[in-house]
C-alpha cells in the first residue's frame, strides 16, 4: 500500500 494509505481514507491527512 502507498504511504498514508488506510482502510478509512485513501490519504491520511
UniProtKB/Swiss-Prot annotation:
Keywords: Amphibian defense peptide, G-protein coupled receptor impairing toxin, Secreted, Toxin, Vasoactive, Vasodilator. The keyword Transmembrane does not apply. Expressed by the skin glands. One of its GO terms (molecular function) is toxin activity. It is found in: Secreted. The keyword Secreted applies. GO terms for biological process: defense response; vasodilation. It holds the Pfam family Bradykinin. Produces in vitro relaxation of rat arterial smooth muscle and constriction of intestinal smooth muscle. May target bradykinin receptors (BDKRB). Belongs to the bradykinin-related peptide family. This is [Ala1,Thr6]-bradykinyl-Ser,Lys,Ala,Val. It comes from Physalaemus signifer. The lineage of its organism: Eukaryota, Metazoa, Chordata, Craniata, Vertebrata.
